[in-house]
């Protein structure tokens, strides 16, 4: 995986520069706060005793995150530069109050370390985002609101294709709502005007980003669209059968 390009700290500033709508976001590079933090987090995960420097790093880390949370406000959306692990919603990215912040940080850090057994996902970049107001069609994965999202693929200045973000198989045995399939089918359709809006933003982004990329568009409760995530195309899930699956 291309961790450097996929990191939110790489693509978000470019979107902001373009004037593309994105959630209010605060980003912190913990390597600049205390270079001992990331090694200390990995040490704790592997059940090793923290030393004095490790404890100092953790204290700084907590202080920075709590300050970020205070500025954004609760509830907030938590992620690293690489992932939010949103399928564990209540235990990772959704932070209802400051009392739950460090618990969710720990869960997200553990997931990141285990995600790649060679080295783990990078965990130096930590992000808090304003929780967008939504009107979910249904909930899944223990309370995660499922709303309208679409993924675009771009390459060298052009739009290759567009797909609904959520395939139906993603919700197998994960939803209590008996009518979720019909709701999903309805929300996975774009009107012609909506496609024009998203195409316009995607083309603007495609002109800025070189190579093969995915763009995730998200609609809030007031029917406004924004970009919530990007990644290199080869590191992004692509609907089966699409001829642009490999760019």
Regions inferred by a protein language model and the residue ranges of each:
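Residue-level preference for alpha-helix termini and adjacent loops
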Residues: 94, 211-212
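Acidic carboxylate-rich catalytic motifs and surrounding loops in phosphoryl-/glycosyl-chemistry enzymes
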Residues: 26-31, 213-219
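C-terminal active-site "lid" helix and adjoining low-complexity regulatory extension at the edge
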Residues: 189-196, 200, 207-210, 219-247
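General beta-strand recognition
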Residues: 160-161, 226
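Active-site nucleotide/adenylate-binding loops and adjacent lid/helix of ATP-dependent enzymes
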Residues: 1-148, 153-156, 162-200
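Short acidic-glycine loop/turn motifs at beta-strand connectors
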Residues: 154-158, 220-223
């Amino acid at each position: 995986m291309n961790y450097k390009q996929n990191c939110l700290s790489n693509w978000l500033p470019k979107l902001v520069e373009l004037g593309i709508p994105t959630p209010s976001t605060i980003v912190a590079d913990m390597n600049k706060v205390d270079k001992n933090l990331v090694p200390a987090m990995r040490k704790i995960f592997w059940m090793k005793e923290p030393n004095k420097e490790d404890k100092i790093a953790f204290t700084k880390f907590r202080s920075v995150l709590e300050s970020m949370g205070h500025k954004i406000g609760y509830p907030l959306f938590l992620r690293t530069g690489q992932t939010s692990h949103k399928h564990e919603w209540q235990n990772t990215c959704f932070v209802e109050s400051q009392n739950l912040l460090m618990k969710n940080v720990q869960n997200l850090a553990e997931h990141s370390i285990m995600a790649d057994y060679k080295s783990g996902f990078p965990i130096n970049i930590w992000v808090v985002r304003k929780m967008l107001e939504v009107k979910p069609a249904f909930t899944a994965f223990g309370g995660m609101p499922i709303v309208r999202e679409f993924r675009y693929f771009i390459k060298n200045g052009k739009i290759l294709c567009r797909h609904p973000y959520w395939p139906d198989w993603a919700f197998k045995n994960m939803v209590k709502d008996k009518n979720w399939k019909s709701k999903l089918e309805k929300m996975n359709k774009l009107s012609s005007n909506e496609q024009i809006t998203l195409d316009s933003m995607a083309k603007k982004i495609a002109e800025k980003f070189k190579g093969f990329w995915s763009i995730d568009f998200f609609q809030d409760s007031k029917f406004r669209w924004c970009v919530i995530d990007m990644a290199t195309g080869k590191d992004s899930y692509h609907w089966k059968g699409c001829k642009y699956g490999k760019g």
